């Protein structure tokens, strides 16, 4: 960050693709007036822009993620959300702060919907899960949510099959949804579901446009063209849409040459509705988003995809599903208020039109 922020005239935002790095840069970004971007991840309390004006997490947060997973089980797999009542839900989580973050919220979700939640830890790196899956076999859950990382994900699928649990009832989170998570599991991954904010495949016109204008023109540096349309490649397109449209939003107000504080305003006023996504050719790949002073996530939407091991490809398994924003807000508010108090931060007044429209905070 220190090496790059003033390079070639100065950066106007940073997206480090890391929960740890983006969180570590929160106060540095505030001091330097540098937007820190964490697409689909980051410090959940950072949703509150009145406390974290330079921190943005466009897409979904941890609580969105798990409420959407529960809504998918109810609405799609069971046919009605009311059928969550009485269900047994296990969450297999990575033994880290990231893995543990969803436990309390899952307890809240099951209290709301009348289901039973059991959290089961897998120590890092997760290449041995026999005892955890024996526990799962004994408890006989209706569904298992996989909050995994790295090798833990394919091992979970393989161990589930060995213990007789249907992988079609194993549902992965945002860090358990890539091609690299399922391909190593081989046939054991057949029927596995995972949440995504950017479905895999050539699902939108913008992908074909990139292929035509970049790769066919010999301008790309992607060595393995088979990765076009993969989960992480499409994540790059999703992030690129958010980045570019926020920059354009800032330029529409301030002119073509913008600084980092003005780009902060661009991110905070990023609006992508259906007509905007249609114009970009991104409908189906990118969810609608509406970032505001009090909501630096702005989307709270995701789809699900299911793995076809024979064809080695994902297929879309749902439409956009919204998270339980109302349920998560209390936890987010508590975390943001505590952070503000602990760090002596004066909150912005997001109801004040003049303050909300001020770019140079």
Protein language model annotation of sequence segments:
Residues 3-6, 44-45, 53-163, 205-208:
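Extracellular/periplasmic Venus flytrap/periplasmic-binding protein
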Residues 267-275, 308-361:
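Conserved C-terminal helix/tail region of periplasmic/extracytoplasmic solute-binding proteins
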Residues 10-24, 38-47, 65-66, 146-154, ...:
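Ligand-binding clamshell of periplasmic/extracellular solute-binding protein-like
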Residues 52, 59, 159-240:
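Extracellular/periplasmic periplasmic-binding protein-like sensory domains
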Residues 1-15, 20-39, 48-57, 160-169, ...:
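Extracytoplasmic "Venus flytrap"/periplasmic binding protein-like
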Residues 11-16, 35-40, 55-57, 88-93, ...:
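Structural recognition of the beta-strand scaffold that forms the well-ordered cores
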Residues 220-233, 244-317, 323:
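Segments of small-molecule ligand-sensing domains
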Residues 36-47, 125, 166-187, 260-269:
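Venus flytrap/periplasmic-binding-protein-like
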């Amino acid at each position: 960050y220190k090496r790059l922020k003033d390079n070639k005239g100065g950066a106007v935002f940073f997206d480090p693709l890391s929960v740890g790095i983006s969180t570590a840069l929160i106060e540095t970004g505030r001091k330097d007036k540098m937007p820190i971007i964490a697409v689909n991840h980051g410090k959940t309390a950072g949703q509150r822009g009145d406390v974290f004006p330079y921190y943005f997490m466009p897409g979904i947060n941890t609580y969105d993620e798990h409420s959407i997973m529960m809504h998918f089980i109810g609405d799609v797999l069971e046919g009605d959300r009311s059928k969550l009542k009485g269900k047994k839900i296990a969450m297999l989580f990575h033994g880290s702060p990231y893995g543990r973050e969803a436990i309390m919220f899952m307890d809240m979700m099951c209290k709301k919907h009348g289901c039973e939640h059991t959290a089961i830890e897998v120590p890092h790196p997760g290449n041995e899960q026999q005892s955890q899956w024996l526990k799962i076999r004994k408890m006989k859950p209706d569904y298992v949510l996989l909050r995994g990382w790295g090798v833990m994900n394919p091992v979970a699928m393989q161990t589930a099959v060995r213990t007789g649990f249907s992988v079609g009832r194993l549902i992965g989170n945002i860090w358990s949804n890539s091609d690299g998570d399922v391909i190593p599991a081989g046939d054991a991954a057949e029927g596995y579901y995972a949440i995504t904010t950017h479905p895999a495949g050539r699902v939108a016109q913008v992908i074909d446009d990139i292929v035509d204008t970049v790769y066919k023109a010999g301008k790309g540096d992607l060595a393995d063209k088979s990765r076009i349309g993969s989960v992480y490649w499409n994540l790059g397109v999703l992030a690129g849409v958010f980045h570019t449209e926020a920059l354009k939003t800032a330029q529409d107000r301030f002119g073509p040459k913008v600084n980092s504080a003005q780009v902060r305003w661009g991110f905070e006023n990023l609006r992508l509705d259906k007509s905007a996504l249609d114009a970009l050719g991104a409908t189906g790949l990118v969810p609608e988003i509406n970032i505001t002073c009090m909501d630096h996530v702005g989307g709270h939407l995701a789809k699900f995809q299911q793995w076809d091991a024979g064809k080695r490809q994902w297929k879309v398994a749902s439409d956009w599903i919204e998270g339980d924003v109302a349920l998560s807000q209390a936890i987010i508010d508590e975390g943001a208020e505590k952070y503000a108090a602990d760090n002596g931060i004066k909150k912005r007044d997001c109801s004040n039109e003049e303050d909300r429209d001020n770019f140079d905070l």
